[in-house]
């Protein structure tokens, strides 16, 4: 059962997203470090539901968009092009804090991702790629979850 209360503030939104994500590439390695903060009197609005929002510094399953939330982003990637052409991996960890639950409890959350991409190299399979994503989400007050996602991607230049 869901209860709602009409307080006349249906579109009273006050939220700004401030963030910076920098990436350093050294040979086959990439290192990323980022910070994002939601400022205002409400959570950051997501007009499309929760799709990957391009104005956040980093794509995450859970978003890190809650009112007053501060999140810290750490990314490491490796391109195996010298050993297995077409294979690359990314490891992401995000920690968010300084936000509260609907009941007013101080909360924190974290998300870890392992992403493996492989673009098939055979000429007759050109444009075909496979992707695996493992997602682990932990939250102090709420529901933790883990997901395994598999994708088959095909791209063609016209």
Q: Would you name each region that the model predicts?
A:
Residues 20, 29-33, 74, 87-91, ...:
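Transmembrane beta-strands of outer-membrane beta-barrel proteins
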Residues 38-104, 111-114:
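C-terminal structural cap/anchor segments
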Residues 14-18, 68-72, 106-112, 144-148:
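Residues that define the transmembrane beta-barrel architecture of outer-membrane proteins
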Residues 5-11, 60-65, 100-107, 138-143:
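Outer-membrane beta-barrel domain signature
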Residues 102-136:
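C-terminal structured domain segments
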Residues 2-25, 32-34:
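A conserved active-site cap/scaffold subdomain adjacent to cofactor or substrate pockets
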Residues 74, 114-118, 144-158:
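Outer-membrane beta-barrel "beta-signal"
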Residues 1-5, 26-28, 35-41, 70, ...:
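Transmembrane beta-strands of outer-membrane beta-barrel pores
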């Amino acid at each position: 059962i869901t209860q709602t209360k009409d307080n006349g503030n249906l579109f009273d939104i006050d939220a700004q997203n401030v963030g910076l994500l920098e990436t350093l590439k050294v040979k086959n390695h990439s290192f990323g470090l980022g910070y994002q903060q939601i400022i205002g009197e409400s959570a950051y609005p997501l007009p499309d539901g929760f799709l990957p929002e391009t104005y956040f510094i980093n794509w995450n399953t859970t978003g890190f968009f809650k009112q007053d939330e501060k999140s810290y982003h750490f990314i490491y990637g490796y391109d195996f092009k010298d050993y297995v052409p077409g294979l690359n991996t990314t490891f992401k960890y995000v920690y968010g804090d300084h936000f509260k639950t609907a009941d007013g409890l101080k909360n924190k959350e974290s998300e870890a991702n392992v992403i493996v991409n492989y673009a098939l190299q055979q000429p007759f399979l050109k444009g075909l790629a496979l992707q695996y994503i493992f997602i682990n989400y932990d939250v102090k007050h709420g529901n933790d979850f883990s997901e395994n996602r598999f994708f088959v991607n095909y791209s063609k230049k016209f």
